[in-house]
């Protein structure tokens, strides 16, 4: 246990003002405290809080604001009830609650997936909590039954224009990172039954069919799941044709069926496929003299095997060309330079393809693993990147493109497309060319719902990403 700084009987506000963030904890044990001041919860940097041996009867729910807390000692008080929001203190590793008057346990404590020390001895626990604690299964039980929150609002189409021509020809596109089973089963915060592969794929299928877009782009689809389930089920239920491409490592693995990749689906009645192309980012990178001469960049890139799928369609009603790009860029936030390199390759390849067709429309969508303030986003939407970042990335040349792409969700207040206990942000996008007019977008998830949970997946969402979709009109 880290040494607790001895700050007894200090005013909370003066503690915050006079002590730097080097102080890891506070010790207010045996001080006769009956109430906790809200000022305490402003000390969000502390990792350890000792409130043992006081006269506390209630713990304010706002204690969860101490998001960095790893050790919380509330033993030897007079506490009868635990606030459910303690379950949002996901960094807790040790929680001491012994010698209180606690009889019931909120299921939300099951979200404390990092908690390895949980003591609640000498409390009048009711059944089944008393027996579960003896068997060291109490937190596990809470995790499996942590379903005490209401569903989100129904997702609806939000019009982006006031007046529509009812005779206009529109089409819809959607993107959805469905979270691979390999990644899902390693998560510690959702109930394990929520992560069951069969349960998840049925929920994913239900989500897809309920939105029922004309063109669907999925990421993190495992090869066996595509071949054995999604390909046939989506053709049967939604009348989709499809194409799938696993990540590059599938070429060298014996068990290639477990490798995930990108899958693009389209309505057979509305589109005729002309061509499908694959962008293997590693292959393009390692064979490009602009990149492979940079030893540091080559070392950082390693064997990252991300891919993108380019599908060229003829729209059946109008005979116009539509290019749809399904992409999944590298995930790690520590590798902004690699994601930017992948974006350069992506836009250059897309520009080459677009020049092969007369006035094509373009929809570029997927999981870009990049925020709106990133170089990837500004490069795609503004064809720009700061000199500072160019120097930092050590690219060695000034990239550019002539594609005019806009973000379909730019005007929508959207707090996240990916939500986990450690990250909440917008990293999935739908970009479209100036030959298209945006007509509608699928509504996002309200903050009121997110306040109830520590992250996705959960009982309402089978992936840690949400489905994004847009409707477009072809310009004449």
UniProtKB/Swiss-Prot annotation:
UniProt GO cellular component terms: cytoplasm; nucleus
EC number: 3.1.13.4
Main location per the UniProt record: cytoplasm
Reaction it catalyzes: Exonucleolytic cleavage of poly(A) to 5'-AMP
SUPFAM superfamilies linked: DNase I-like, Outer arm dynein light chain 1
Required cofactor(s): Mg(2+)
Cell compartments where the protein resides: Cytoplasm; Nucleus
Keyword Nucleotidyltransferase: no
InterPro entries to which the protein is assigned, alphabetical: CCR4/nocturin_mRNA_transcr (IPR050410), Endo/exonu/phosph_ase_sf (IPR036691), Endo/exonuclease/phosphatase (IPR005135), Leu-rich_rpt (IPR001611), Leu-rich_rpt_typical-subtyp (IPR003591), LRR_dom_sf (IPR032675)
Subunit: Component of the CCR4-NOT core complex.
Cross-referenced PANTHER family: CARBON CATABOLITE REPRESSOR PROTEIN 4 (PTHR12121), POLY(A)-SPECIFIC RIBONUCLEASE (PTHR12121:SF100)
Family: Belongs to the CCR4/nocturin family.
Function recorded in the entry: Acts as a catalytic component of the CCR4-NOT core complex, which in the nucleus seems to be a general transcription factor, and in the cytoplasm the major mRNA deadenylase involved in mRNA turnover. Ccr4 has 3'-5' RNase activity with a strong preference for polyadenylated substrates and also low exonuclease activity towards single-stranded DNA.
The protein, known as: Probable CCR4-Not complex 3'-5'-exoribonuclease subunit Ccr4
Originating organism: Vairimorpha ceranae (strain BRL01) (Microsporidian parasite)
Gene it is expressed from: CCR4
């Amino acid at each position: 246990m880290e040494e607790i700084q001895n700050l007894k009987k200090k005013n909370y506000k003066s503690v915050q003002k006079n002590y730097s963030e080097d102080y890891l904890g506070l010790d207010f044990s045996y001080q006769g405290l009956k109430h906790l001041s809200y000022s305490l919860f402003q000390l969000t940097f502390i990792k350890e809080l000792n409130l043992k041996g006081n006269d506390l009867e209630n713990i304010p729910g706002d204690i969860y604001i101490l998001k960095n807390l790893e050790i919380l000692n509330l033993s030897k008080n007079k506490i009868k009830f635990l606030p459910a929001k303690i379950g949002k203190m996901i960094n807790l590793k040790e929680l001491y609650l012994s010698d209180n008057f606690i009889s019931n346990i909120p299921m939300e404590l099951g979200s404390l997936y990092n908690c390895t020390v949980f003591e609640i001895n000498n409390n009048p626990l009711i059944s089944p909590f008393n027996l579960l604690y003896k068997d060291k299964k109490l937190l596990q039980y809470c995790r499996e039954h942590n379903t005490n929150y209401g569903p989100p609002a129904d997702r609806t189409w939000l019009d982006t224009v006031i007046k529509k021509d009812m005779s206009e020809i529109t089409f819809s596109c959607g993107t959805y990172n469905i979270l691979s089973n390999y990644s899902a089963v390693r998560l510690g915060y959702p109930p394990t039954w929520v992560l069951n592969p069969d349960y998840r794929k049925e929920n994913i299928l239900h989500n897809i069919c309920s939105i029922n877009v004309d063109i669907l782009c999925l990421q993190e689809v495992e090869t066996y799941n595509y071949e054995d389930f999604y390909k046939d089920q989506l053709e049967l239920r939604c009348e989709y044709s499809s194409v799938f491409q696993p990540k590059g490592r599938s070429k060298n693995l014996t068990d290639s069926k477990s490798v995930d990749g990108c899958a693009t689906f389209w309505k057979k009645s509305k589109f005729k496929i002309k061509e499908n192309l694959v962008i293997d980012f590693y292959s393009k990178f390692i064979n490009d003299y602009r990149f492979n001469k940079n030893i540091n960049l080559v070392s950082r890139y390693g064997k990252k095997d991300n891919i993108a799928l380019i599908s060229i369609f003829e729209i059946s009603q109008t005979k116009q060309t539509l290019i749809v790009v399904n992409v999944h860029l590298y995930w790690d936030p520590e590798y902004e330079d690699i994601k930017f390199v992948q974006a350069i390759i992506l836009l250059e390849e897309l520009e080459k393809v677009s020049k092969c067709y007369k006035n094509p429309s373009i929809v570029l969508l997927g999981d870009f693993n990049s925020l709106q303030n990133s170089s990837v986003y500004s490069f795609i939407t503004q064809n720009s990147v700061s000199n500072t970042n160019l120097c930092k990335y050590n690219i060695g040349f000034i990239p550019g493109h002539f594609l005019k792409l806009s973000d379909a969700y730019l005007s929508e207040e959207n707090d996240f497309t990916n939500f986990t206990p450690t990250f909440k942000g917008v990293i999935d996008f739908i970009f479209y060319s100036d030959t298209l007019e945006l007509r509608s977008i699928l509504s996002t998830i309200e903050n009121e719902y997110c306040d109830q949970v520590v992250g996705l997946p959960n009982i309402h969402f089978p992936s840690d990403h949400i489905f994004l979709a847009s409707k477009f009109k072809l310009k004449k």
